[in-house]
Each structure stands twice: as structure tokens, then as C-alpha cells.
Amino acid sequence: FEKKISSYQDSKYGIGVGNCTDAITISLKALGVTSDSEVITTSNTAVPTVTGIVNAGASVRFVDVNEYSLIDVNKIEKAINKKTKAIIPVHLYGQMCEMDKIMELASKYNLKVIEDCAQSHGATYKGKKAGSIGDVGCFSFYPTKIFGAYGDGGFITTNNLELYDKIRRIRFLGMEKKKMSSGHWNGKYYAIEHGTNSRLDNLQASFGNIMIKKIKLWNKRQLNIANYYSK
């Protein structure tokens, strides 16, 4: 299931977690965000975005939205200070933020970018899928989302192998398997850093394997409905 979702979102790696709130928290921790850090996000978002930041120990700095109800990139730079460590653009209702400008700011100020993709499965920005542009993308599989499972579920995408390994450890109590000198796995797990217990359960993954076959149809139907209202 992880391979299917990451492939669909045009990302090299994918990690299933308990929910999107955990996905944001784990991603921030993996990216080095600490208690003395500030994270910029939009004020027009659901509580879980902010909860994910606070759970990582960081402070939130809100930026207002543009005419499309997405984070105003022209106001992000004014909010950046010496404590700023990351930006969380929130893609809403299948519409993506101006990611090229956000990535330019991130590069200029050496900031991390965590895409909140809870409402944008399959969305694209200039030919690039949601969750494939920033350092990580965080998704929700809650039943009311564009792509819902049977219950709670979350997902993290990234194109960075080192970051993938760290996220995978953090979501499983900081543990990983060790290899013996022969190169074979010794079957034991070692806790090498602090982590949490936030794995995507098999039921949600199994349900997701079925539902992913329908996501293109759902997105097409929603676009047709949106076009109808636009008229």
C-alpha cells in the first residue's frame, strides 16, 4: 500500500502512520524542528495542522490567505525570523499553494517545507503532484477526505532516503533492525532514538488498496461538480 500511494503521488518513498496529525508531528521532528522553533502556516486550516506543530514542541506563526483561500506567499517572508525553521503550506479542496515561490523562500532562508496534503490527494501544481515538492508531504485517510480509508490513517511522502529512514524509525518507537556481519538481518529491533507508536494498521492499508483504484474517478467527478458551480 505504501508503494502504491507514494507512486501515485510521484514520490520515491512513503510511510504509513496513524493519522495526518501524527504525520505532521513526526515530519517536523525528523526535520529537526525543536521547542525553540517557529513554524509558519496559514490561519485558514483545521486544528490538526496546528496540533501537529504544537505536539512537535514548536510555536505557530500564522500567515493570512490570498484571494483563493490559500496561504499568501507575499506575506510569508515578512513572518520569517531567526526562530523560523519550517513552512507548512496547506493545500485545500484539491487546490495547491504556490509551491514554486514557497520553495524559493525556503531555499533563501534555509527552511524546511512540509506540505499539508490532507485535502489534496492527486492534486497537481505545474505538473507536480501534492507531496512531491516540499521536503515531505502529509496526507490523511480519514473517511471524509478525498481519499478515505475505513477509519483513521495518515501518510508521509518524501524523495529523501535519509529522511525516509528517520521518519520510519520515529513512527515505530525509534526502532530499526540491525544487520549481522554476514549481511543478514538478526531479527532484533534496536531503539536508537526517541520515537512514538504511530503505524498505519493493516485494516486501513487493506481498505486503501481497494479505494485507490477509485481515486481518479472521484477526482474527476469532483472537478465536474466544481466546474458546474463555476458556471
Residue ranges of model-derived segments:
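Solvent-exposed alpha-helix faces
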Residues: K3, D10, N44, F172, ...
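Phosphate-binding glycine-rich loop
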Residues: F1-E38, G52-N55, F62, K128
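Active-site phosphate/pyrophosphate- and oxyanion-stabilizing loops and adjacent acidic/basic residues
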Residues: K3, D100-M103, D152
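Active-site region of PLP-dependent enzymes
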Residues: S120-K126, I133-K231
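PLP-dependent aminotransferase-like
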Residues: K29-C117, T124
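Alpha-helix termination/capping residues and helix-transition junctions
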Residues: Y8, V33, N81, A130-G131, ...
